[in-house]
């Protein structure tokens, strides 16, 4: 289990202040626990029970064990690579820890009324805690750790209805699978770009993400209203777009991390988005037309706007002038997101022969 606070080893490890919340940083979520507890799983109970049995096996119980490869690995990185890698560790640890908190609270709050659902969430909380702890331990190699207890108490929590939790976490888990497996496969072919031994663990790690995504797939199928009808189609499109756009803008903004791994951030993200979009067709009624060139052109405009907004924040201009500079960028972002949302989606049935 993740410790509630970061523990300094012989006073050598400092507690790192969490990054300032922005639209691109990981969110912490809460939901309507009574609604979750009252869910009738019978429409897809057999599949959920089968997935829970997979969780019980805990395939990665002995996987996240550090070895001698970590000794001195941090000292081999140049200052810029250290900076972008620590940023990656921090963002990843925060994301995994937010999942742990949500899943743990769900398992605790619905245990009496919905034991099968509660057990599934407890197993996923176990996995997320393991991931977050492993990432935070890697941060200690660089002389710092996150105070996870402070994050628990002081982070703002976003309330989502259960169905929105399903959409967001399903996409987060599936996109996490494709991100991790893509990096792992690239580094297997290009070992000279493996800047830190944590990447050796990504192959098994990504299978946890995949199983979690499969759980939410089965859970949505047990609640047919989440994936059927015109309103469900609109929400599926919205969450696909929000997740893809956020990832693309964030990753291009920190492209130096991917360059350190020998990857191009745009090429990497395009592959991850295409694969996730294809995978999502297994459960969502519609997916995005990511093969339309306009999709990528509009994402690039979001990247440009985000860069301009960050530049305005860094400037020493007076607050009114900063606002004047940022306002047209905000308006442009809204317009581009609207154009992206209004692009014709693809019926998931057209993807089925290709979905594996």
Curated annotation (Swiss-Prot):
CDD domains: ACSF (cd01047). Belongs to the AcsF family. This is Magnesium-protoporphyrin IX monomethyl ester [oxidative] cyclase. One of its GO terms (biological process) is light-independent chlorophyll biosynthetic process. Its cofactor is Fe cation. Keywords: Chlorophyll biosynthesis, Iron, Metal-binding, NADP, Oxidoreductase, Photosynthesis. GO terms for molecular function: iron ion binding; magnesium-protoporphyrin IX monomethyl ester (oxidative) cyclase activity. It catalyses: Mg-protoporphyrin IX 13-monomethyl ester + 3 NADPH + 3 O2 + 2 H(+) = 3,8-divinyl protochlorophyllide a + 3 NADP(+) + 5 H2O. The keyword Acetylation does not apply. It comes from Parasynechococcus marenigrum (strain WH8102). It holds the Pfam family Rubrerythrin. Pathway: Porphyrin-containing compound metabolism; chlorophyll biosynthesis (light-independent). It comes from the Bacteria. HAMAP family: AcsF.
